[in-house]
From Swiss-Prot:
GO terms for biological process: alternative mRNA splicing, via spliceosome; primary piRNA processing. Its EC number is 3.1.-.-. It comes from Caenorhabditis elegans. It is an enzyme of class 3 (hydrolase). The keyword Cytoplasm applies. This is Schlafen-like protein 2.
Length: 433
């Protein structure tokens, strides 16, 4: 018999919308927010082969949607890509396409969620009555990198889940395996505690340059011209992170396409360290979005080249010591955390709603992009908006076709990785020297 994992499947508290409440067992959740969907994924993703099942019991009136989603899919299951949902209004949905399916459900109903990876189909049941196949899914969902996780969604409602730790109210039959009993070789486990790929560094930052600068921290400002090219500081006016992702994607893209660099979030243009107000949940939320953004670069940005550190800014008064950037970055930089996306781009992120509702501290975030390997062939990256950026002096410049040609000539290489759109235009150029 195949070995099964001793770990218990549950809802993932580090992969949820901010205001969804998950209980201590990880097997129940509720939302008291009206007219807003809040969701969460489970900790066990399923891939390869097999037939899997879990149950959801609706424990209060309101709207619910249940189903499956990849780590890269939207928590609003059924509206985004790579997610499949069945809702209380009696509709199935994926990628914003809603169709009548099954029956409506409400308080005390038990919904069975079926995933058949052998036939690549998804369907549901209500109180033991199975409905026809709802979706035929792509073969990519059999891959461990795009595997499907149980996912639930609430709007002013509550529910409980049973991944198999308790007897099912409506057993699915011998052919199906409970999610919690899936063989190890078919499970991609994820939770913050298990991966533990991100821990923030807490240090005191004694930055000061003048004794009359009271309770402000300042970075060493005597930067050489070459240092300016590889250094950028960003600070939102209100000290939040709600609009940080869109502009920093340009900087990360530019660093990837040149010689790397360091991006300081929470430092204004005058090099004064103001910090960013963040709660613990906001940290998870922000970095999940940041990772997802980088994975949507073309080609996918190599996360091995990107390191992230977070430092808590603790006021220590004004002192005469000047701490240089090089000293600061002796602190250990941690690998990119593996979290799923919540919000990407220039739109307001839900993170900022917590600023006045949860305990927050001031943090300095450092994103360090290492230089490319000089012995490898040149790769030109587009950010998630499909644009190519490169560092010029202390700013990011959108790169046009002439610049792309020059970038390749500078590297003196013919074989260059390019997105298909750029390659089609580059092909019209004469042969490079």
């Amino acid at each position: 018999m195949a070995d099964t994992s001793p770990r218990e499947s549950k809802l993932n508290k580090q992969d949820q919308d901010l205001h969804l409440e998950i209980d201590e067992t990880g097997l129940a959740c509720k939302s008291e927010v009206k007219k807003r969907w809040l969701g969460a994924r489970g900790t066990a993703g399923l891939y390869g082969n097999g037939k899997y099942y879990y149950e959801v019991t609706i424990t209060s009136k309101g709207l619910c949607r249940v189903g499956w989603a990849t780590l890269g899919g939207s928590l609003n299951i059924g509206k985004g890509l790579d997610s499949f949902g069945y809702g209380g209004t009696g509709m199935k949905s994926t990628h914003k396409k809603f169709d009548d399916y099954g029956l409506p459900f409400t308080l005390n109903d038990v919904i069975g969620c079926y995933l058949d990876l052998d036939s690549r189909t998804i369907w549901w049941s209500k109180n033991g009555e199975q409905f026809p196949a709802a979706f035929s899914i792509d073969v990519k969902y059999k891959n461990s990198n795009t595997c499907l996780f149980p996912a639930v969604l609430c709007q002013n409602s509550s529910l409980s889940v049973n991944f198999g730790s308790q007897p099912f109210k409506f057993p699915p039959g011998n052919q199906f395996t409970a999610v919690s009993d899936a063989p190890n070789e078919n499970v991609n486990w994820w939770s913050y505690e298990e991966q533990n790929s991100f821990e923030h560094v807490v240090v005191k930052l004694p930055f000061a340059v003048e004794e009359d600068v009271h309770n402000e921290f300042r970075m060493h400002t005597k930067l050489m011209l070459t240092e300016l090219k590889r250094t950028q500081c960003k600070q939102d006016k209100d000290g939040s992170i709600r609009r940080t992702l869109q502009p920093i994607s340009k900087t990360i893209c530019a660093f990837l396409n040149t010689d790397g660099g360091r991006l300081f979030l929470g430092v204004n243009d005058d090099k004064v360290i103001k910090g960013i107000s963040m709660s613990k949940n906001m940290i998870y939320h922000f970095f999940g979005s940041l990772r997802h953004m980088c994975e949507n670069f073309k080609p996918c940005s190599p996360l091995c080249r990107i390191k992230v550190s977070i430092l808590e800014v603790i006021p220590v008064g004004v002192i005469k010591v000047k701490l240089r950037k090089a000293d600061l970055l002796k602190e250990e930089a941690h690998d990119f955390p593996k979290l799923a996306c919540h919000s990407v781009g220039g739109s307001f992120c839900d993170c900022f709603l917590e600023i006045n509702k949860a305990p927050t501290k001031q943090y300095l975030l450092i994103i360090q992009v290492s230089p490319p390997n000089p012995n490898s062939r040149t790769t030109i990256f587009q950010n998630e908006e499909g644009l190519v950026y490169r560092r010029r002096m202390a700013s990011n410049k959108c790169v046009y076709l002439d610049d792309l040609r020059r970038m390749m000539n500078e590297k003196n290489q013919v074989f260059v990785d390019l997105p298909d759109e750029a390659r089609a235009e580059i092909d019209s150029f004469s042969k490079f020297d």
